[in-house]
Design a protein with these regions (language model features):
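Glycine-rich, positively charged N-terminal anion/phosphate-binding segment
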Residues: 2-7, 27-110
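N-terminal small/glycine-rich loop or linker at the start of catalytic domains
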Residues: 4-21, 59-60, 78-85, 106-122, ...
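Active-site mouth loops of central-metabolism enzymes
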Residues: 13-27, 87-93, 116-132, 188-196, ...
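Alpha/beta enzyme core
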Residues: 32-37, 41, 122-271, 280-295, ...
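Glycine-rich, proline-tolerant flexible connector loops at the mouths of alpha/beta enzymes
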Residues: 46-61, 79-94, 147-167, 217-224, ...
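C-terminal helical cap(s) of enzyme catalytic domains, especially alpha/beta-barrels
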Residues: 51-69, 222-243, 286, 298-330, ...
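Active-site beta->alpha loop and helix N-cap motifs at the rims of alpha/beta catalytic domains
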Residues: 68-169
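Extended, intrinsically disordered, low-complexity segments
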Residues: 68-76, 251, 259, 308-387
Length: 387
């Protein structure tokens, strides 16, 4: 008999699928609806000490592509397929004092479901580190099963928050360590893809004591410009700032980032996020080594909390385990990470005839052939400039 249940960072989940920190998890009612729908866990909208003020107008929209001309636009039109989501929403506009009693009520209503509190404060001084600790203590005392540190929002209105922490390995380590000093529950770090190498920041989080890394948040991006009006498709008074791109378009990039991290830290815990709407996509993250998978965009388009999405995910997992019963697979752990080591350096991919391959170097008659170290990868342009 197949089992959906997993244990991740010491927390038992009824299934490995979570609704991620985003607009769908911004209210008590939505989180309760998500648990009623069957999600194994929910990560709250990011909680801060004080309320924030979002921009006027739309905070998020969806980009669609037309099969006839392949255009990508936020405009709704017949036959267009989902391409991605775009948002420039900040963290929760409700302060910690608003969230604390609601966390308690949610856990009382669903004691067996996993409630993760996403939190964020600033960085760069001891006061902000204490703010992280205050948030951690309040959320865990209110019933949160774990904490997710938001090091990844790409468009915060303060320079010492969000992805600006996630781009700095020193801050990743220091903030994580400060939270771990106060935490009695597992601590996850949610990283930004907007960095040179996420392995570096993941390592910093683990040095700080992180129990897991979540990858990744949305990719920094701009909305499209309407070719007729020459205005950004989402703007305020004609102006726009960078926002976050999510949904199907980021799936391959998110998988590549995840593969680098799970290969670097095969014995560590990872939660995958980015571009998932059904089990076949979630399976990619599990096969690369993730213990849980989070969903946002697909849920937003399905009654805000994704009742049909979680049904498909659970049904897909059940069917997959049944198909592989002869392989002895009964749980996610039986197949988790079995494709992680298939991701290798490009130089390790077989050529039609290895004797003809010079590793990208031209063989010049009269000169000795270059000695190419095993596993060598040519430097990027940026690396070449630095050297």
């Amino acid at each position: 008999m197949p089992h959906r249940a997993v244990t991740f960072t010491g927390i038992p989940f009824e299934n490995p699928f979570l609704l991620s920190s985003a607009p769908p998890t911004e209210s008590e009612n939505n989180i309760l609806r998500a648990f009623e729908a069957g999600w194994g866990g929910v990560v709250t909208k990011t909680i801060g000490l004080h309320p924030v003020t979002n921009v006027v107008g739309a905070k998020a929209k969806f980009l669609r592509t037309s099969p006839d001309d392949a255009s990508v636009s936020m405009k709704k039109r017949p036959g267009a397929a989902l391409h991605s989501s775009w948002n420039w929403e900040l963290i929760s506009d409700k302060p910690l004092d608003w969230w604390a009693p609601r966390l308690r009520r949610i856990k009382e209503a669903f004691p067996s479901r996993v409630l993760i509190a996403s939190i964020m404060a600033g960085s760069g001084n001891d006061k902000e580190l204490r703010n992280w600790q205050t948030l951690a203590r309040a959320c865990q005392e209110s019933g949160a099963d774990g904490l997710e540190l938001n090091f990844s929002c790409p468009h915060m209105d303060r320079k010492d928050m969000g992805s600006n922490i996630g781009k700095d390995e020193g801050l990743c380590s220091v903030v994580t360590e400060a939270v771990k000093e106060a935490a009695t529950v597992p601590v996850w770090c949610k990283l930004t893809p907007a960095t040179r190498d996420m392995v570096v920041e993941a390592a910093a989080c683990f040095r700080g004591g992180a129990d897991a890394v979540v990858s990744s948040n949305t990719f920094p991006s701009l909305p499209m410009i309407d070719p007729e009006t020459l205005e950004f498709e989402i703007n305020v008074d004609g102006k726009v700032s960078s926002g976050g791109l999510g949904g199907p378009a980021i799936l391959p990039m998110s998988l590549a980032n995840m593969a680098r991290m799970t290969r670097a830290f095969p014995d560590r815990a990872f939660s995958g996020i980015g571009g998932v709407s059904d089990f076949s996509q979630a399976l990619n993250y599990l096969l690369l080594g993730c213990g849980t998978v989070q969903v946002c965009t697909a849920a937003m388009l399905d009654q805000a909390v994704g009742p049909r999405v979680i049904q498909k995910l659970n049904a897909g997992l059940d069917a997959f385990l049944e198909r592989h019963a002869a392989d002895g697979w009964r749980t996610v752990d039986d197949f988790r990470g079995i494709r992680r080591d298939r991701v290798v350096l490009q130089s390790e991919i077989r050529r039609p005839d290895a004797s003809d391959y010079e590793g990208g170097y031209e063989h010049v008659e009269g000169y000795a052939a270059p000695v190419i170290p095993e596993g060598y990868a040519p430097p990027t342009r940026a690396e070449a400039r630095v050297s």
